[in-house]
Amino acid sequence: PLLFASKMKIDAMRDLAGVTLLASIPNAIVAGPKLPGNTLKEAIAYIKDRPGQFNYQAPLGSYSHLDMLALTAAAGIKMTHLPSRGAGETLPALMRGEILISNSNVASNIGAIKAGQIKALAVTSAQRIAELPEVPTLAEAGFPGIGSLNWNGIFVPAKTPKAIIDKLHEIGRAHV
């Protein structure tokens, strides 16, 4: 909401109150089959030797995009950002070799990762995830402080009475 505040009809920070967190989903730095190697370090070395030759894809202004900007800057690599509408567009492009790398949510990519169609090089969470225990975190891969989580939550108008927010929170937590 903050990146697109001028286009929104509400001020999310002023007009909404948080009720409960529903889900928190890490991203993974994923690579297509054309990338040699299986680690983030190998990917960065390959890209660094070929500056400006490769693209990455992420929705413009998204957590994925911002994390990739931070990662490419920290790694000293040059890549072209190709905006996407999300994992539904990015995953096929990775598998076809149209893009080399992406930062996309694990939930949308887990099937292709497990099937060996794409490679997970690192996850954006603070700890390794149970579904991909062999994949290091960005911090473990040498990039501490980079990485965000996708999350979903329930919000209500800011003027909602606290008693109602508390009850909705209780109900939400009981069902998540």
Residue ranges of each PLM-predicted region?
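Conserved helix-loop-beta element of the AMP-binding
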Residues: A17, A43, Q117-A130, G147
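Extracytoplasmic "Venus flytrap"/periplasmic binding protein-like
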Residues: A5-D11, G111-V123
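Short beta-strand and adjacent tight-turn residues that come in two discontinuous sequence segments
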Residues: S84, N103-N105, V123, S148
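Hinge/capping helix and adjacent helix->loop/strand transition within the periplasmic-binding protein
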Residues: L3-E89, L138, L149-R173
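Short secondary-structure boundary segments
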Residues: P33, V106-A107, S125-A126, A158
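Basic phosphate/pyrophosphate-binding loop/patch that engages nucleotide-derived ligands
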Residues: A43-P51, I110-K119
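Short helices/loops that flank or line small-molecule/ion binding pockets
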Residues: L69-A74, G88-S102, A107-Q117
